[in-house]
Amino acid sequence: MLVPKRVKHRREFRGKMRGEAKGGKEVSFGEYGLQATTSHWITNRQIEAARIAMTRYMKRGGKVWIKIFPHKSYTAKAIGVRMGSGKGAPEGWVAPVKRGKVMFEIAGVSEEIAREALRLASHKLPVKCKFVKREAE
């Protein structure tokens, strides 16, 4: 699972997710990609579930690039704890994904296989997605 090796601050602010992604909107490594059409936090477990769904469908053929990384920690208080008395303990890691960001890329397989593999991966994610192809240079 994807987690940072070390971080400067264990607890982060939630932040705002306004507008579109600044970079990473085009397919750059592979031939086909999965682009987010809405913004959301994606956990490291969701990224791993999507990766497994893709690689299983492709039967270990082709290559997959994961272009998002869960660098932001989120916190949660224990169940049954009253409000106040500080921020909760770090619970997990998320990747804030804005709309327009290409999250996964695939190469080395046919378009039909890539389309279906990315469709299966999109069902594991909390964002609406669309299939994109690499633009001819």
UniProtKB/Swiss-Prot annotation:
Q: Which GO terms describe its cellular component?
A: cytosolic large ribosomal subunit
Q: Which UniProt keywords apply?
A: Ribonucleoprotein, Ribosomal protein, RNA-binding, rRNA-binding, tRNA-binding
Q: Which Gene3D superfamilies match?
A: Ribosomal protein L10e/L16
Q: Name one GO biological process term.
A: translation
State the source organism's domain of life. Bacteria
GO terms for MF: rRNA binding; structural constituent of ribosome; tRNA binding
Q: Where are the coiled-coil regions? A: none
CDD domains xref list:
Ribosomal_L16_L10e
Question: Which InterPro entries does this one have?
Answer: Ribosomal_uL16, Ribosomal_uL16_bact-type, Ribosomal_uL16_CS, Ribosomal_uL16_dom, Ribosomal_uL16_sf
UniProt xrefs under Pfam families: Ribosomal_L16
The UniProt entry, under HAMAP family, shows: Ribosomal_uL16 (MF_01342)
Q: How does it assemble?
A: Part of the 50S ribosomal subunit.
The family note in this entry says:
Belongs to the universal ribosomal protein uL16 family.
Q: Which PANTHER family match?
A: 50S/60S RIBOSOMAL PROTEIN L16 (PTHR12220), LARGE RIBOSOMAL SUBUNIT PROTEIN UL16M (PTHR12220:SF13)
- Role this protein plays: Binds 23S rRNA and is also seen to make contacts with the A and possibly P site tRNAs.
According to UniProt, the name of this protein is Large ribosomal subunit protein uL16
Q: Which organism is it from?
A: Streptococcus pyogenes serotype M1
